[in-house]
Amino acid sequence: MMKVLAVNVGVARPNPAKRADLTGIDKLPVDHAVQVRAPGPKHVGLHSGVVGDPIGDTKHHGGDDQAVYAYAREDYDWWEEELGRELPGGFFGENLTTTGIDVNGALIGEVWRIGDTLELQPTFGRIPCSTFQAKMGEPQWLKRFARENRTGAYLRVVTP
């Protein structure tokens, strides 16, 4: 059974990859409720589906099809073993750190229900970006991350 271990929200910081001036990839767990909404189109909408979560590169991130990003604790555990270092929830920039669900095997269009009313729908797996590469500092990280098919899932908001 799926469980949300943490809801993570970012803080706008200088982007180490310099693609955009700022990035919101640095996310930390919050201990309060957050509002989730459909943000609208990528280039003109509210960008993030999680209120208060900044997106620096709105050309490539955000919008309805990338409203929320989920990553599984089980995949973090696998990467910790591979990389030999600790990776806390939120480190990959996800809004939801989950357990008990194969996030990478999510079917596009299925509906995830969280809490009493929130419904999210997987849209596609993460395509890693240069900001993620810079944050990780691992050689060939983008290719390695994609090759291992442990990308997590982007989600659209069906019912806030």
Language model segments and positions:
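Electropositive, beta-rich accessory/interaction domains or terminal extensions
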Residues: 1-133
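Well-ordered alpha/beta subsegment
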Residues: 153-160
